[in-house]
């Protein structure tokens, strides 16, 4: 049996994707529509107060293409807090006009593939804590995709030795480091939580960097032999004070 990688786990993560039902929203009188939007704004501004206490974070993005219109990403210390947010969101009047298109449940994760030996408690390391319990950058653009490590008769990631996986992940990581300062990456583990094994969330002020890093990674052995991917979602940052314009219908 191959040795399993150990993980450090941080905040729980919930990506919620919605399409706006514009046809139904269009027939709502303007004053009622404005009230829906105001209630939605207040809800998100209230949930965002966790930032000041460093007990979570969240981000809102306008997704490009027909897979979704909005992405709401929430990070919280407990899974049940994510349930509470989703339940309270579903009670909002605006929820009647937002059609769920996709969701992803996971937890911020760091593996020990590239970790050196140390006697210190990693959860007390400031650098590690900042990665497990992050302050999201709220860059202009976001890219999210789920992924698996391939396991079939020809290529099975989980049958490789720890040393083989460490070498592959080191080479993989070297490519990622080339994009430091251009892309901020968050890996969330989802084995037992969702249909894929990991979620990858990228932030950048230059949307083209997503294409560049994903393409370059295709030539890396870790990805070429062992990577399997779900749908990609790309979008632009939207703040709650922009909701009036976003939901406006002339």
Curated annotation (Swiss-Prot):
GO process annotations (BP): heme B biosynthetic process
Residues involved in Fe-coproporphyrin III binding: 131, 145-149, 172, 185
EC number(s) given by UniProt: 1.3.98.5
Biological or metabolic pathway of the protein: Porphyrin-containing compound metabolism; protoheme biosynthesis
Cofactor binding description: Fe-coproporphyrin III acts both as a substrate and a redox cofactor.
UniProt keyword terms in alphabetical order: Heme, Heme biosynthesis, Iron, Metal-binding, Oxidoreductase
S-S bonds: none
Molecular function GO labels: heme binding; metal ion binding; oxidoreductase activity, acting on the CH-CH group of donors, oxygen as acceptor; peroxidase activity
Catalytic reaction equation(s): Fe-coproporphyrin III + 2 H2O2 + 2 H(+) = heme b + 2 CO2 + 4 H2O; Fe-coproporphyrin III + H2O2 + H(+) = harderoheme III + CO2 + 2 H2O; harderoheme III + H2O2 + H(+) = heme b + CO2 + 2 H2O
Presence of keyword Isomerase: no
InterPro entries noted in UniProt: CHDC, ChdC/CLD, Dimeric_a/b-barrel
EC class name: oxidoreductase
Superkingdom classification of source: Bacteria
Requisite cofactors: Fe-coproporphyrin III
Active site location: 145
HAMAP family assigned: Coproheme_decarbox_1 (MF_01442)
Function of the molecule: Involved in coproporphyrin-dependent heme b biosynthesis. Catalyzes the decarboxylation of Fe-coproporphyrin III (coproheme) to heme b (protoheme IX), the last step of the pathway. The reaction occurs in a stepwise manner with a three-propionate intermediate.
UniProt record similarity statement: Belongs to the ChdC family. Type 1 subfamily.
Protein name, entry field: Coproheme decarboxylase
């Amino acid at each position: 049996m191959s040795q399993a990688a150990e993980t450090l786990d941080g905040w729980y993560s919930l990506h919620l994707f919605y399409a706006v039902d514009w046809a139904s929203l269009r027939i709502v009188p303007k004053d009622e529509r404005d009230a829906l939007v105001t209630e939605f704004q207040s809800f998100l501004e209230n949930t965002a107060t966790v930032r000041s206490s460093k007990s979570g974070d969240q981000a809102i993005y306008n997704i490009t293409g027909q897979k979704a219109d909005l992405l709401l990403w929430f990070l919280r210390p407990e899974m049940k807090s994510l349930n509470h947010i989703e339940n309270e969101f579903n009670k909002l009047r605006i929820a009647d006009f937002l059609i769920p298109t996709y969701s992803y449940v996971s937890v911020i994760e760091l593996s020990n593939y590239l970790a050196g030996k140390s006697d210190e408690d990693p959860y007390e390391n400031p650098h590690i804590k900042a990665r497990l319990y992050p302050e999201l950058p709220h860059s202009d653009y976001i890219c999210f995709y789920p992924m698996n490590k391939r396991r079939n008769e020809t290529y099975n990631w989980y049958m490789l030795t720890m040393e083989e996986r460490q070498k592959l992940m080191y080479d993989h990581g070297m490519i990622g480091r080339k994009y430091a300062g251009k892309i901020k990456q968050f890996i969330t583990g989802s084995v037992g939580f969702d249909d894929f094994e990991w979620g990858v969330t990228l932030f950048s002020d230059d949307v083209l960097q997503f294409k560049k890093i994903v393409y370059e990674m295709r030539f890396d052995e870790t990805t070429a032999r062992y990577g399997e991917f779900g749908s990609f979602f790309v979008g632009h940052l939207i703040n709650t004070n922009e909701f009036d314009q976003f939901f406006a219908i002339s």
